């Protein structure tokens, strides 16, 4: 009996005690790391949901801004239609050109009058358009920062797609919009799924909506900015920009106005 007890005691050596302490330390460390990672995940989800709420509020604000503007835009389009029916080809072209200039002036004026808001991070911005892609159930406002700095853009991207480059929305040139890829259904996460022929709608502050058609999609290095060129041959174009799922490249979706 005593021999058995002695034998059992021999198994609990200093080395075994040391290993048990090490295992216990690693176990506690693992639990701590899991808790930290879980906390980061919960915070990230909270931050994304909060951003989605802000984005929805921006969309509601845009809808309020557009109230009462649709009628004026429709009248302008009807005037063009009357010219087509009653005027000569040359007169029609002149009237269409004049109408485009008036419309551009209206957009510029509306953008200048747009209310500047302040983000939670203290950056100034204003809503300038709404972008909608029916295929992927995407509809968000497009905001423009006051300074256009990288820090400002990165901050505003948490709440909305942001104007990256170009003239006013729905005007001749290449209107570029950048949006986050959260690898879910929020913001531009599904933009990489678009294909040639898909429709993208852009509504400016006058209430005018223009349909654009995807004609090219490709990826580039983050430093490659050739797709933001304003040389469009007199066409109205729209470019959507987001990152790939691994964030190593940028997804570029080029669109042109549907006439």
Pin down the residues of each PLM region.
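N-terminal Lys/Arg-rich, disordered targeting/topogenic segments
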Residues: 1-22
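Solvent-exposed, non-transmembrane regions of membrane-associated and secreted proteins
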Residues: 15, 19-259
């Amino acid at each position: 009996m005593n021999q058995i007890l002695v034998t059992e005691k021999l198994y609990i050596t200093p080395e075994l005690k040391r290993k048990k302490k090490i295992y216990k330390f690693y176990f506690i460390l693992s639990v701590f790391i899991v808790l930290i990672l879980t906390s980061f995940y919960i915070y990230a989800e909270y931050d994304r949901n909060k951003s989605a709420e802000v984005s929805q509020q921006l969309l509601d604000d845009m809808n309020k801004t557009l109230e009462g503007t649709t009628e004026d835009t429709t009248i302008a389009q009807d005037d063009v239609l009357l010219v087509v029916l009653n005027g000569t080809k040359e007169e029609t072209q002149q009237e269409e050109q004049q109408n485009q200039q008036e419309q551009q002036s209206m957009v510029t004026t509306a953008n200048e009058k747009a209310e500047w808001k302040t983000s939670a991070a203290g950056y100034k911005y204003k809503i300038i358009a709404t972008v909608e892609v029916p295929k992927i159930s995407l509809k968000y406002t497009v905001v423009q920062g006051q300074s256009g700095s990288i820090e400002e853009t990165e901050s505003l991207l948490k709440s909305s797609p942001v104007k990256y480059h170009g003239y006013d929305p729905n005007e001749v040139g290449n209107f570029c919009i950048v949006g986050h890829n959260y690898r879910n259904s929020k913001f531009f996460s599904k933009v990489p799924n678009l294909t040639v022929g898909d429709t993208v709608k852009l509504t400016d502050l006058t209430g005018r909506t223009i349909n654009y058609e995807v004609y090219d999609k490709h990826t580039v290095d983050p430093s490659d900015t050739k797709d933001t060129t304003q040389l469009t041959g007199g066409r109205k174009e729209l470019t959507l920009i987001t990152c790939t799922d691994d964030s190593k490249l940028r997804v570029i979706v080029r669109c042109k106005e549907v006439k």
